[in-house]
Amino acid sequence: SFARSQGLLAMEAMWTRYLPQSTILRALLESGDLGQPELFAAQFCTDNRAVKRLWTTVGGGTLFDMGIYTLAMAQQILGNPSTISSSGIVGAHGIEQELSVSLGYESGARAHLLISGIATLPQVASCSFEKAQVSLHAPFFVPSAITIGTKDFYPDETTWKDTTGIQGHEGLAYQATWFADYVAQGLVESPVHPHEDVVATLRVMEEILESLSTT
């Protein structure tokens, strides 16, 4: 609100939403060709025990550093959940090490997220829609690829891959480009990731931690 009152652009550094595969996904969602989303699944599981910032009592934990990417992708596809439940492993000083999160939506759609800072699994995100299935290749939160397929057991598939040579965290450059364009337009928030989305995701994460503490 302060940035808005000053006429300044404020954006969260949720760079995954500005990657090419996310732009393609957004276009598919807006077209309506996929139908309504049914079931979303994503996992961000990497043995990050050597990354000290994750395990500090101030700002530590896997949810805010890693899990936010799964939640932001779920939000892009499904919106904000109406029900939240979680379970997991809590380590020293009450810092979450691993979480399994289930989200329910008023539409009837479901999302299941797996986040771990102690185990490693492929970092993929997929969603079943009424008319198709969509998969974001690992690691889904950096420049990668997107596959759209039929819902058959052996689906017909079409894949787009980022061939720019931009890899890993170099993908931050995509959001920087969008940011520069928004500044030139005089915007105060991102149309593809508005402030209300940022705040909503933070609230969901707080509820996840509350749910975890009571299980």
Label every model-predicted segment.
Residues 72-145, 171-173, 177-187:
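Contiguous beta-strand/loop segments that form the cofactor/metal-binding neighborhood of enzyme cores
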Residues 106, 178-215:
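C-terminal helix-rich "cap/oligomerization" subdomain common to oxidoreductases
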Residues 1-14:
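Beta-strand-loop-alpha-helix segment that lines the small-molecule cofactor/substrate pocket
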Residues 20, 24-27, 73, 100, ...:
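Alpha-helical elements of Rossmann-like donor-binding domains used by nucleotide-donor carbohydrate transfer enzymes
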Residues 52-59, 154-162:
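Short glycine/proline- and charge-enriched loop/turn segments
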Residues 7-9, 36, 107-109:
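Short, well-ordered coil/turn segments that N-cap beta-strands
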